Design a protein with these regions (language model features):
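Sec-dependent, cleavable N-terminal signal peptides
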Residues: 1-20
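Primarily extracytoplasmic/secreted proteins
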Residues: 17-262
Length: 262
């Protein structure tokens, strides 16, 4: 009995975080993985190449231009009636708004998700994308940040935001930035300046008054994440920026190891 107790006491469980895995990205347009939100639409279908898998997570983001502050998306929906939550919203302003939504432990068997923009008084332009992920924690939603910026002509400031301290070291950070630019053919978006990011899509040409970028990274510390995009000087006072970011905890497994007894 004494030996058994000693054996149990001598074993310790240490949490080990396995990297979250990207399963697939919606792929509706050009460039890859971006769906253009057309002028005057109230819904937009986001289509995947394969059916979604039971138990996985889906993260969606959208950014759009609208001529007044009436631009507002409601929650996404799908045929499996999965429940989506709004993880980040840059907030209402004229010309630009960005969102991030997510749903977890999904009921799969579907290959499309609908983004909803009801009640608009006019048309809008924008971009959106959705990704399916596996390997997130059972309760993955952690923190996030959002911001807007109203520029002036020749201004190279950007919408930036900083998350709160993360709940754990290993988290997925997912951001979408949108820029309403005065028919600029290339806004020269760059990756966020802090950390190493993977781009999901990037639209540099704002010929329809709408440029955008979605980006993600995995953290290795609980330090707050600073998100700051770079771009060219704004060509007009009507230009606007918005950014929305959310963080998601990665699932942990336990690794047993021996502890030397003193």
């Amino acid at each position: 009995m004494t030996k058994l107790v000693a054996l149990i006491v001598g074993l310790l469980a240490t949490p080990v975080f396995a990297a979250a895995t990207l399963v697939q990205t919606s792929d509706n347009g050009t460039p890859d993985h971006v769906q253009w939100i057309d002028y005057g639409t109230s819904t937009q279908s986001m289509t995947f190449g394969s059916n979604l898998t039971n138990g996985n997570s889906v993260i969606c983001g959208a950014g759009a231009y609208h001529s007044d502050s009436g631009l507002e998306f409601t929650l996404p929906s799908d045929a499996s009636t999965n429940t989506y939550t709004e993880r980040a919203d840059s907030g209402a302003q004229a010309y630009s708004r960005a969102y991030v939504w997510a749903t977890h432990a999904i009921t799969g068997g579907i290959s499309s998700i609908t983004l909803n923009m009801p009640g608009l008084t006019g048309g809008l332009y924008g971009q959106a994308t959705c990704q399916e992920w596996s390997g997130l924690a059972a309760s993955p939603n952690d923190t996030g940040c959002q911001a807007t910026l109203a520029g002036t002509a020749g201004d190279d400031a950007e919408a930036n935001c900083t998350t709160a301290t993360l709940a754990q070291a290993e988290e997925l950070v997912w951001c979408l930035s949108h820029m309403a630019s005065d028919f600029d053919s290339n806004v020269n978006y760059t990756d966020p300046t802090t950390g190493t990011w993977t781009n999901v899509f990037r639209v540099q040409d704002a010929a329809t008054n709408s440029a955008g970028s979605a980006d993600r990274r995995t953290t290795s510390a609980t330090t707050a994440v600073v998100v700051q995009y770079g771009h060219d000087d704004l060509p007009a006072t009507t230009d606007r920026w918005s950014v929305a970011c959310a963080t998601f905890k990665v699932a942990a497994t336990s690794t047993w190891h021996w502890r030397r007894r003193r």
